[in-house]
């Protein structure tokens, strides 16, 4: 089904002749904003219903328009609307198809409305829905990490700084770090949603309208919290779009971090984890390969998310009030960013929840004892030694261990005593990783009780979210 494109576009009513084909080719946006058809139709239905309630259009005409727009929405969803470049954008496609269905009554629809406040509303409705979709995907991701964390409360491994073994932590504590990250991401999406959920309709092109619109009624019909307060700002404001893409970009950066760890941990060199075959790929040449593409794609998608954000900010930079056609270019990053995040989050969630973590290999990586050097320093601090002095003494022990080719855990009590007079026989207890964790029970620390408390807190939080 194709809307009639022979009629002169409404935006050229005061212009002579037809637009140059080169301008038309440059101006076409339907390939991008066509994805906004549902939001555009929803806004139009709320607008025309308000016009009827205000006595601006006949109620019977408004009812016909609302019913016909339901049909147009169904045709878009079924792929029956063929995009016509001559009609430029989604708004014109909807309006032309509406005209075919209800005739001249379609002309009532645009009373008191401009493309400028119309598209601003469409984007806000999209952003609200996108925030909900991203939040749901990140919640699924949190649940995947939480399930593995619960299964690995007693699994210990080296924690890393600078990708060097640093101190022992539990795998549960490590996985809960990602639950925290994605929790902050969800908070950001909630904040973006709250700021986006207001209606700009009634702002017109830039200066409102003389018609007696009920802006609050439209907002209420759309489930929005209120209306904008400055018409110039309302038609040119894309802050919520930028905030959405920032939230997507930061969540994608967090996904890239677990992506990198999946890549590292599944190497033979680390051997900490094995991906399910369902979340790995092979090689077209090397038959033995099992590649962690899910992690690599998560890393790569972060670059795309960052690019979307920078692209939008560059479009917005330096625009004078109010609306400028530059804003047409916001659709591609805005519409693609949230979808990419949801796809990536769901794939990573599947990879994490089906991965096998190798506890014995992780604990083996702690065997040499250097990850417990800080415990030896704090042993001295517990005995009244200033930390810097203790740090220096253990540093000398570490250097001696390296020269001798013996792990720190294998040094004798007598050897430890040569590095500081306060070292006694029980210093060797410092090199028990599980004992070390049991001594780290501050809130947020990796001690078993602290980790169990965090598991319970997140299980309660996500349980409430599910209800």
Swiss-Prot record:
Biological process according to GO: arginine biosynthetic process via ornithine; L-arginine biosynthetic process
One GO term describing the cellular component: cytosol
Reactions catalysed: 2-(N(omega)-L-arginino)succinate = fumarate + L-arginine
UniProt record similarity statement: Belongs to the lyase 1 family. Argininosuccinate lyase subfamily.
Cell compartments where the protein resides: Cytoplasm
Annotated metabolic or biological route of this protein: Amino-acid biosynthesis; L-arginine biosynthesis; L-arginine from L-ornithine and carbamoyl phosphate: step 3/3
Keyword Repressor applies: no
Xref: PROSITE patterns: FUMARATE_LYASES
GO MF entries: argininosuccinate lyase activity
Subcellular location, principal: cytoplasm
Entries under NCBIfam families matching the protein: argH
UniProt keyword Amino-acid biosynthesis, yes or no: yes
PANTHER family in UniProt: ARGININOSUCCINATE LYASE
UniProt name for this protein: Argininosuccinate lyase
Highest taxon in the source lineage: Bacteria
UniProt cross-references to InterPro entries, sorted A to Z: Arg_succ_lyase_C, Argininosuccinate_lyase, Fumarase/histidase_N, Fumarate_lyase_CS, Fumarate_lyase_fam, Fumarate_lyase_N, L-Aspartase-like
EC code: 4.3.2.1
Gene that encodes it: argH
Organism: Anaeromyxobacter dehalogenans (strain 2CP-1 / ATCC BAA-258)
